[in-house]
């Protein structure tokens, strides 16, 4: 059974890096102390893979996990196949997906997660768990072979969702950008995840975690609000 924790971001309000995720992760990984976590650092454009691995190790130290970045393997895919848990960090989603294709990780991750290996990811790492990365907020600074992602959660995800416009901002709001996507892709569902929220996926059900509701947009921007602590079939 699929077991995934998809988190909107690595910070919430003024919390330190990944601190707000620790209670969720402690429960999610309660049976995995001492186990090997394959970490995918490809989204971290402004820091090296070594630096990203160290940052995540330090932030999650209390969970007593063996975190190993995939770049440590002769073949990156080897680390995925040896892992007890898979984690994908945030950053630029286009860079992330491009390198996942280059290192042939998509099928390996998909197979592991579908067979029960826990998966957690934040921001871009949540994005790529969905059907495609077409509702990311990131600039397309590089071009993956396809926008198609892992499709473990068979819908679109928009992390870091903020409703409306900031004063003085004359560009499109997030709702307007998602409306554009749904005009072109009217059969899709988009799960907009505000800061400090997460989806816990168990099999074919999802539970909303955090301090805010998650919004599900469909054709013509019809809204289905998923309340905090609610569980629904997706």
Swiss-Prot record:
Q: Where in the cell is it found?
A: Cytoplasm
User: Which Pfam family, giving just one, matches this sequence?
Assistant: Peptidase_S51
Keywords of the record, alphabetical order, are: Cytoplasm, Dipeptidase, Hydrolase, Protease, Serine protease
InterPro entries reported in the protein's UniProt record: Class_I_gatase-like, Peptidase_S51, Peptidase_S51_dipeptidase-E
Q: Where is the active site?
A: 123, 138, 160
Which domain of life, per UniProt? Bacteria
The record's EC number reads 3.4.13.21
Whether Endoplasmic reticulum counts among this entry's keywords is no
Q: Name one GO cellular component term.
A: cytoplasm
Query: Record's CDD domains?
Result: GAT1_Peptidase_E
Enumerate the Gene Ontology biological process terms.
proteolysis
A molecular-function term among this protein's GO annotations:
dipeptidase activity
Its UniProt entry gives the catalysed reaction(s) as: Dipeptidase E catalyzes the hydrolysis of dipeptides Asp-|-Xaa. It does not act on peptides with N-terminal Glu, Asn or Gln, nor does it cleave isoaspartyl peptides
Tell me, in a sentence or two, what this protein's role is: Hydrolyzes dipeptides containing N-terminal aspartate residues. May play a role in allowing the cell to use peptide aspartate to spare carbon otherwise required for the synthesis of the aspartate family of amino acids.
What family is this? Belongs to the peptidase S51 family.
Quote the protein name from its UniProt record: Peptidase E
Protein source organism:
Actinobacillus pleuropneumoniae serotype 3 (strain JL03)
């Amino acid at each position: 059974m699929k077991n995934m924790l998809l988190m909107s971001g690595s910070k919430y309000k003024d919390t330190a890096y990944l601190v707000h995720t620790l209670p969720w992760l402690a429960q999610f990984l309660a049976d995995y102390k001492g186990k090997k976590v394959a970490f995918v650092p490809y989204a971290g454009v402004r820091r090296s893979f070594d630096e990203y691995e160290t940052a995540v190790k330090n932030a999650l130290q209390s969970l007593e996990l063996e975190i190993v970045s995939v770049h440590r393997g002769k073949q990156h895919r080897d680390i995925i196949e040896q892992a007890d848990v898979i984690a994908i960090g945030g950053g630029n989603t286009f860079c992330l997906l491009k390198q996942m294709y280059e290192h042939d990780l998509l099928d390996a991750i998909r197979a592991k997660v579908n067979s029960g290996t826990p998966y957690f990811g934040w921001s871009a790492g949540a994005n790529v768990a969905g059907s495609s990365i077409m509702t990311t907020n990131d600039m397309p600074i590089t071009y993956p072979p396809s926008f198609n992602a892992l499709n473990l959660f068979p819908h679109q995800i928009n992390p870091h969702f903020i409703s409306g416009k900031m004063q003085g901002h004359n560009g499109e709001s997030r709702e307007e950008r998602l409306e554009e996507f749904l005009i072109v892709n009217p059969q899709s569902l988009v799960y907009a995840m505000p800061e400090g929220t997460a989806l816990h996926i168990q099999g074919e059900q999802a539970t909303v975690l955090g301090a805010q509701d998650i919004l599900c947009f469909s054709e013509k921007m019809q809204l289905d609000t998923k309340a905090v602590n609610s569980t629904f079939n997706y």
